[in-house]
Amino acid sequence: ALVKAIAKACTHTRYAYENMLASLSQYTKRELCHLMGAGYAGFLEENCDLDIKCPVLILVGERDEMGKVKQYCSAWQENTGYPLHMIKGAAHNSNVDNYEQVNMEIEEFTEALPE
């Protein structure tokens, strides 16, 4: 039940859901809980002002309901001016839900970078 709940929470398309189920099915409930705890602890620890020395592109699924990801991404964009693009028809795993748009956004971003 935990694997299905996680897969449902972070995906929007059937393909992404099945992909997430396959990825998570290798873990026990205890391992999943440990990984989630470690991930959140690391996020809280790393959620600070950063001085990033390379170009940044922020991508977030328009249907991302994981925690406050959309809020954080919007605030990050407002505070830094980094470009933020919403991925249509995608949840937290936007690169699987809508890989075509994700790839297009990355390609356009990298092509526009100065040489």
Annotate the PLM regions.
Residues 32-35, 72, 102:
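Hydrophobic alpha-helical packing elements
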Residues 96-110:
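Post-His helix in hydrolase/transferase enzymes
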Residues 114-115:
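Alpha/beta-hydrolase-fold serine-hydrolase catalytic core, especially in secreted/extracellular enzymes
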Residues 1-51:
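Conserved alpha/beta-hydrolase catalytic His-Asp/Glu region
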Residues 55-90, 96:
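Conserved loop-alpha-helix segment in the C-terminal half of the alpha/beta-hydrolase fold
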